[in-house]
Amino acid sequence: MKTFGRVLTAMITSFNNDGSLNIENSVAIANHLLDNGSDGLVVCGTTGENPSMSKEDKLALFTAIAKECGHKGSIIANVGSNDTKSSVEFVKEVSKIDGIDGLLVVVPYYNKPNQQGQYLHFKAIAEATTLPIMVYNVPSRVGTGIFPTTLAQLHSEYPHVCAIKEASGNLMIASEIKRLIPGDDFMVYSGDDGLTLPMLSVGACGVVSVVSHVAGKDMNAMIQAYESGHNHEALRIHQSLADIIKAMFITTNPIPVKYAARKIGLPAGVFNLPMCDPSADEAAYIDRALAEYVK
């Protein structure tokens, strides 16, 4: 199966103290990730504080990372919104950028469309680009989710709708997707670091990861071990990552991971409101988990 890679990091974005985008530091983070276990990057996703970024800043960051880092791995641009018209317009702009390998498109949030509305939303986007599309299913943030049957219909009509970041937390959904879309031309990625190993067992090919900012090599090694039939080694790595994964989600993402990135020396910069630094107790918890992990 040709995939975007095993470990795709949903990367943080670096901002200056005044809240403006720091492209140089963001590119440095991207290079670090690709040199330390990541096969590709998701740029300007939730972890990258996409809601607080302007369209112009997103386009500038997509362009810079594709140009400076695209030779090292897959570059996937997050382009989704809950308005179909503006999503289509943005997709057309992003599709013109050299070096973008795929698009991440979330199920429309807050307005909670039914399955027909979701189908028509993704249909309009698919007709606006030839780039591979990864659907992002995350009911906990969106308020609803795409059904495997809707996804299968989209893929049958638009083969470049060819991947999903599956973050429902329900292994049966991933299993049903693989049943309805058999073969190697559709990629299922875990959208939850802690469920990556069990997701592999029902047909996933990798993970869109947050913890890979600090544990990218181990995440990649775990997937490679599973693929090679070394299940006990994969389980050992999975268990060794449990505490650091838990620490990355003790409060809302990307608060823990951006704090952790600073602690390991990455130029992560400040948060843009409404995101803010972790509490003292949360920071202490993350510090302990990092110290234990790097031993």
Predicted regions and their residues:
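A general structural signal for well-ordered alpha-helical segments in protein cores
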Residues: 26, 58, 62, 87, ...
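Basic, gly/Ser/Thr/Pro-rich low-complexity segments located predominantly at protein N termini
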Residues: 24, 50-53, 85, 168, ...
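Hydrophobic side chains within alpha-helical segments
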Residues: 19, 60-61, 168-169, 195-196, ...
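Catalytic alpha/beta core domains of metabolic enzymes, predominantly
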Residues: 127-128, 141-249
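C-terminal alpha-helical cap/extension of soluble enzyme domains
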Residues: 7-13, 32, 36-38, 93, ...
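Active-site beta->alpha loop and helix N-cap motifs at the rims of alpha/beta catalytic domains
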Residues: 2-9, 14-143
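Short helix-capping segments at alpha-helix termini
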Residues: 67-73, 97-99, 129-131, 156-160, ...
